[in-house]
Swiss-Prot record:
It comes from Shewanella sediminis (strain HAW-EB3). Its EC number is 2.7.2.11. It catalyses: L-glutamate + ATP = L-glutamyl 5-phosphate + ADP. This is Glutamate 5-kinase. The gene is proB. The keyword Transferase applies.
């Protein structure tokens, strides 16, 4: 591979379960060899590669001979615990063919929610890359509960791209990319090759279809792409079975759907707010508050809150939505849900008299907010 043809220097590659199993109930080792070869070629050409791999539960099912996916959380976590060791062993053996070492990082949302743990994870990633070691990331499904799960490896890979300041995120799936209709039911569906802006019409196109044995569909890939591109990371969604797909993507050949990055990406702290934080509640705002936040860059005051939804403590990240339920911003609350139920719709000057204390006039300060 000619280094001059490469447009990126640090790349995150996400492999979905449907890619790793080729639609079967076990890992497709032959295909994994080819994917490892492509990533090894990038490493040899000077491109740093981070691999975000699904497939732990599928590997566990194969190793233990489970015919069907169990219903209980405990048994799914059992399969993840057994399968993760098999998965990392397989990747370690494959990359060793090319003289490359791997390092495993198992993450949960809690690791990304806490600022110190987030920075520690970033340091670990950078240390591995500095030594020419391929970081292999997966969600820690063996211990994760719904409250601390990222939820799918599409979103986890987007967060990994932010963690390591990647230039490109490649989401490989069983589809060629994003289409203007469902290609499985509409033979006239056309591939969308370039996306500059992600809006509601595009989200509607993505739908909620789930691929194969995994948990992520095109909707989750679109969500991941939006997170990454806001942080200045380009994104490509493509078929994991397209010949040379990883190398073609990095060499800027036409493959899949390409999402351009924002020209003015979010600064580091706001990237963390958008990508690392668990969103635990929702604030419905009036039109005046919406305009102040989106058009004037103001902080959110209690007066503009119409309704509070969810249970959360001070410091939680919340969805800020309009009267129709459309999210337009996300931010860290200085007040708990209990507090906000008492001060919603009230003037900031009344907060101390209503609560007996205050944490400032702003419910969500503009420095702790990301306008979407």
């Amino acid at each position: 591979m000619n280094l001059s043809e490469i447009g990126y220097r640090r790349v995150v590659v996400k492999l979905g379960t449907s890619v790793l199993t080729s639609g079967s109930r076990q890992l497709d080792k032959a295909h994994m060899v080819e994917l490892a070869r492509q990533m090894a070629a990038l490493m040899k050409a000077g491109v740093e590669v981070v691999l975000c791999t699904s497939g732990a539960i599928a590997a566990g099912r194969e190793h233990l001979g489970y015919p069907e996916l169990p219903d209980t959380v405990a048994n799914k976590q059992l399969l993840a615990a057994v399968g993760q060791s098999q998965l990392i062993l397989a990747w370690a053996q494959l990359f060793s063919i090319y003289g490359l070492h791997v390092g495993q990082l198992l993450l949960t949302r809690a690791d990304l929610h806490d600022r110190e743990r987030y920075l520690n994870a970033r340091d670990s990633l950078n240390a591995l890359l500095a030594q020419g070691i391929i970081p292999i990331i997966n969600e820690n499904d063996a211990v994760a509960t719904n409250e601390i799960k990222v939820g799918d490896n599409d979103n986890l890979s987007a967060r990994a791209a932010l963690l390591c300041d990647a230039d490109l995120l490649i989401l490989l799936t069983d589809q060629r990319g994003l289409f203007d209709a469902d290609p499985r039911s509409n033979p006239d569906a056309k591939l969308i090759k370039q996306v500059v802006n992600i809006d509601d019409s595009l989200r509607l196109l993505a739908g909620g279809a789930v691929s194969g044995l995994g948990t992520g569909g095109m909707a989750t890939k679109l969500e991941a792409a939006d997170i990454a591109r806001r942080a200045g990371v380009e994104v490509i969604i493509a078929s994991g079975h397209h010949p040379r797909v990883i190398q073609d993507a990095v060499c800027k050949e036409s493959v899949g759907t390409h999402f351009t990055a924002l020209e003015n990406p979010l600064e580091s702290r706001k990237q963390w707010i958008l990508a690392g934080q668990a969103t635990r509640g929702k604030l419905i705002l009036d039109q005046g508050a919406l305009n102040a936040v989106t058009q004037k860059g103001r902080s959110l005051l209690s007066k503009g809150i119409v309704r509070v939804e969810g249970k959360f403590e001070r410091g939680a990240t919340l969805h800020l939505v309009d009267s129709d339920g459309r999210e337009f911003a996300r931010g860290m609350s200085r007040y708990s849900a209990k507090d906000l139920h008492l001060i919603a719709g009230k003037h900031s000057d009344d907060i101390e008299s209503l609560l007996g204390y205050d944490y400032g006039d702003a419910v969500v300060h503009r420095n702790d907010m990301v306008v979407l």
